[in-house]
């Protein structure tokens, strides 16, 4: 039986962790210094976050060899 392939789009956007959670980077940070974003908006966009359980289930299907 051939090896299952990981979805390349998911590979670029998400990181499955050993704990079973899926880490991602927030959208809208390409141009953080853009005019129109408040300090609070920029602060909340910093860093990474984990997906909700419902979305996590869908994304995990894209990673056949992740736990």
UniProtKB/Swiss-Prot annotation:
UniProt record, GO biological process: translation
Region named Disordered: 1-20
Superkingdom: Bacteria
Alphabetized InterPro entries for the sequence: Ribosomal_bL35, Ribosomal_bL35-like, Ribosomal_bL35_CS, Ribosomal_bL35_sf
Pfam families tied to this protein: Ribosomal_L35p
GO molecular function terms attached to this record: structural constituent of ribosome
Gene3D superfamilies: 4.10.410.60
DNA repair is among the record's keywords: no
Disulfide bridge positions per record: none
Entry annotated with the keyword Cytoplasm: no
Key words of the record: Ribonucleoprotein, Ribosomal protein
GO cellular-component term (any): cytosolic large ribosomal subunit
Stored PANTHER family: 54S RIBOSOMAL PROTEIN BL35M, LARGE RIBOSOMAL SUBUNIT PROTEIN BL35M
Protein family: Belongs to the bacterial ribosomal protein bL35 family.
Protein name per UniProt: Large ribosomal subunit protein bL35
Source organism of this protein record: Anaeromyxobacter sp. (strain K)
């Amino acid at each position: 039986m051939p090896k299952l392939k990981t979805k390349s789009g998911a590979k670029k956007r998400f990181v499955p962790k050993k704990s079973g959670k899926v880490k991602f980077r927030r959208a809208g940070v390409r141009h953080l210094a853009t005019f129109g974003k408040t300090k609070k908006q920029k602060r909340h966009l910093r860093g990474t976050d984990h997906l909700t359980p419902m979305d996590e289930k869908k994304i995990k299907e894209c990673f056949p060899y992740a736990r």
